[in-house]
Amino acid sequence: MSRVLVIGCGGVASVAIQKCCQVDEVFTEMCIASRTKEKCDALVEKLEGKTKTVLTTAKVDADDVDQLIELINSYKPDLVMNIALPYQDLTIMDACLACGVNYMDTANYEPEDTDDPEWRAIYEKRCKEEGFSAYFDYSWQWAYRKKFEDAGLTALLGCGFDPGVTQAYCAYALKHEFDQIDTIDILDCNGGDHGYAFATNFNPEINLREVSAPGSYWENGHWVEIPPMDIKREYNFDQVGDKDMYLLHHEEIESLAKTIPGVKRIRFFMTFGQSYLDHMRCLEDVGMLSTTPIQYNGQEIVPIQFLKALLPDPASLGPRTKGKTNIGCIFTGVKDGKEKTYYIYNVCDHQECYHEVGSQAISYTTGVPAMCGALMMLTGKWVKPGVYTVEEFDPDPFLDALDRYGLPRSESHNPKLVD
């Protein structure tokens, strides 16, 4: 029996909550909290009669630590699942520390205001020291490690698919397939078609900031940074086919470089269609991806937030998105003195996700791992004081849970490698 507070009620949170309610013997009570309480109430109404989980809702501004503390102290959860925006990771972690509650999220911290002078000074120092310039990184949350250790609390970072499952795949490969992993290529393919000329499959603001940033990868002990979309490869994905993919910076590279001993290279690739790239470059050229506020008709607006309001809500894409995703990791390395390769991945069908939980596969592949990570914490399988990423825990029960609850793994011991 457990009591869980979920902060957020967007597309990913909706999936995670519905999947939690399928495991009502563990998730016995749940409070869904968001700035827009009406969305929480609508989801509870949808789930009425379909679960034994006792559901309540609350209104909260996740940017306000005092509001969060009041809510957490009032509800007294065993775990806070942060499925809001990565901008709010630190305020929610602060509130969990103040209230003595375990924490988890699906994406690492990044600031909403990238022009904030205090943040900018720390960011520019990190760029020089580390060698990559993405706005998002783990350093802000890793800085909480001792606080969580001293409090006897667990914080689980980035438990979606990528990051999240991809790191569990790496831990699994190291545990069962290799004595030494030399290279890791993380491949994220979305073969879905939603019929729009341009739309994003998750939060547009986060998505567009991520893909328009310089790419980077880890090689021979240091970061190598490249211009955005500068490295392109074609790959034939199981059940999807040939797709163009581009090298991006992605957060799990940062943790895997520290947790996979002796790894020589880690890269992350994501597929994009030409229409998406053309629209994104045009929007960037005219300043619509900027996070710097501007004045318009006497009002201050942030261009990328205005753009987000114009684009289709990712949560609305479910009924019209067809096709499949394929996300996984390709490894090279050594086992018993012999070189070997290994590929572990998941294929997920957009329409099957929609029929089950009313979502497209992008939200599904993030929401299901969030539920499974919470399940690991609540059942005592993933509990140790401190701040950790997914690969720092035993991957076996987590991957078994994914197999059971909708994201089964596939494997190949003779995959085509990415050059």
Annotated model-derived regions:
Residues 35-39:
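Helix N-cap at the beta1-alpha1 junction of Rossmann-like dinucleotide-binding domains, i.e.
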Residues 61-77, 88:
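Conserved Rossmann-fold cofactor-binding substructure of NAD(P)-dependent oxidoreductases
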Residues 9-10:
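Glycine-rich Rossmann-fold phosphate-binding loop(s) that bind the pyrophosphate
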Residues 72, 78-81, 103-104:
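N-terminal Rossmann-like NAD(P) cofactor-binding module of classical short-chain dehydrogenase/reductase
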Residues 107-153:
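Rossmann-fold NAD(P)-binding glycine/threonine-rich loop
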Residues 50-64:
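Rossmann-fold cofactor-recognition segment
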Residues 13-14:
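N-terminal Rossmann-fold NAD(P) dinucleotide-binding loop
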Residues 175-419:
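C-terminal catalytic/substrate-binding lobe primarily of soluble NAD(P)-dependent oxidoreductases
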